[in-house]
Design a protein with these regions (language model features):
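Conserved C-terminal alpha-helix-loop-beta "cap" of PLP-dependent enzymes
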Residues: 278-366, 370
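Glycine-rich beta-alpha junction loops
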Residues: 16, 29-35, 205, 253, ...
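PLP-dependent enzyme catalytic core of the Aspartate aminotransferase-like
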Residues: 5, 10, 116-117, 125, ...
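Conserved PLP-enzyme active-site core in the AAT-like
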Residues: 2-3, 8-17, 76-277, 282, ...
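Acidic-histidine catalytic/liganding microenvironments
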Residues: 71, 272-276, 324
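N-terminal "arm"/small-domain region of PLP-dependent enzymes with the aminotransferase-like
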Residues: 1-58, 66
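Conserved N-terminal alpha-helix of the aminotransferase class I/II PLP-enzyme fold
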Residues: 35-85, 110-117
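A common structural junction motif
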Residues: 236, 324-332, 385-389
Length: 389
């Protein structure tokens, strides 16, 4: 029983299919599987994990699902071709015309676009609330509200959500509580244990951990995942077996990587707070963070994500980034290498400027995904780049 094993052991062993005695799950680069009588019966009965066709399931996707469920403490799950495919399937699979959702005003840019541009076309309306104030979520609930949507940490301003308080509100009003746990990974927080119904991941990020795949995952109860399975099949956002293999490989080192990501980010945040070229430093480990107390309760191990505001605005921030030699200017996060971006010209490019500013993405705002390099090399790189502004 994997639930009896400790987290690090689950990251290595859960889900691995030792076919033909292989230490790792072999890559089954096949679009289809032999349709035996047993599999045909399972398919006809609607069994979601029957190996028939790789858009439905594959050996490699099943191995990943089992591991993620073991790490999140979930009953079941599905794998997707991207994080947005996972989020879209949850929204369109569990909501219908006339339903209402309450979500965070500073939700991830891709999710914001889905909620403001696509869902209304299907008659699904979204009210944006303040993730830092659970009472604002409760105040936004309507008679037709079906779901509360939250993120463990907001992107990119790193607000910490009081997941337990949100779970209390969701339970009180009999609503689904859906959370994007990408920014902390299962190593950093356990939303299902705190009362969430569905946990979403962009597996591109910390779970994959090497910036070499794009993927998504949804885990939760057997009943909810069973509702989502036919939607996944209909929408077609299935992952490739080779990408699944790389994801499983990446997850095996999750418990080794995450402590370094987090300790590096905490140390650099502490030093940036004292740097004369930095206006504001944002990291949940800092006592100056407005959600410090909540963070210590919800995600005490921290995160490898870091944000700060460079004095001089966006032009100064861009000059700083272009002078970096180790930290790589690129979108995404959660890989072993450090990545940096200005949200105004990347993740939040298509969010109106007043909305960005209200969410805390002010001129000079920089987001960094701190990798597992030596912290002193990272700090020297940051220092020399700031010195050249």
């Amino acid at each position: 029983d994997d639930s009896e094993k400790r987290f690090a052991t689950r990251t290595v062993h859960s889900g691995t299919q030792h076919i033909e005695g292989a230490v790792n799950t072999p890559i089954f680069q096949s679009s289809t599987y032999y349709l035996s009588d047993e599999r045909y019966a399972g398919w006809a009965a609607g069994a979601q994990h029957t190996l028939i066709y790789s858009r439905l399931s594959s050996v490699n996707s099943e191995a990943c699902v089992e591991k993620i469920c073991a790490l999140e403490g979930a009953e079941d799950g599905e794998l997707f071709a991207s994080g947005m495919a996972a989020i879209s399937t949850v929204m369109l699979g569990l909501l219908s015309n006339g339903d209402h959702v309450v979500a965070s005003a500073d939700v991830y840019g891709g999710t914001y676009g889905l909620m403001t541009e696509e869902l209304p076309r299907f008659g699904i309306n979204v009210t944006m609330a303040d993730m830092q104030d659970p009472s604002s979520y409760e105040a936004a609930i309507q008679e037709n509200t079906k779901m509360l949507y939250i993120e463990t940490l907001s992107n990119p301003v790193l607000k910490v959500c009081d997941v337990e308080a949100m779970a209390t509100i969701a339970k009180k009003h009999d609503l689904l509580l859906v959370i994007d746990n990408t920014f902390t990974s299962p190593w950093g927080s356990q939303p299902i244990a705190m009362g969430c119904d569905i946990v979403i991941h962009s597996t591109t990020k910390y779970l994959g951990g090497h910036s070499d795949i794009v993927g998504g995952a949804v885990v939760g109860s057997k009943d909810l995942i069973a509702q989502l399975f036919p939607k996944k099949v209909h929408f077609g956002g299935a992952p490739d077996p080779h990408a699944c293999y790389l994801l499983e490989r990446g997850m095996r080192t999750l418990s080794a990587r995450m402590p370094i990501h987090c300790s590096n980010a905490s140390e650099i945040a502490r030093r940036l707070e004292k740097h004369p070229m930095i206006e504001t430093t944002i990291h949940p480990s800092l006592p100056s963070h407005p959600d410090y107390d909540v963070g210590q309760r919800i995600m005490p191990k921290g995160t490898g994500m870091l944000a700060f505001v460079v004095k001089g605005g966006d032009d100064a921030a861009l000059r700083f980034m272009r002078n970096l030699k180790i930290i790589f200017e690129a979108t995404s996060l959660g890989g072993v290498e450090s990545l940096i971006e200005c949200p105004f010209n990347s993740s939040h490019m298509f969010i109106p400027e007043p909305v960005r500013t209200a969410a805390g993405v002010v001129p000079g705002f920089v987001r960094v995904s701190i990798g597992i390099e030596d912290v002193e090399d990272l700090w020297q790189d940051i220092q020399q780049a700031l010195d050249q502004i």
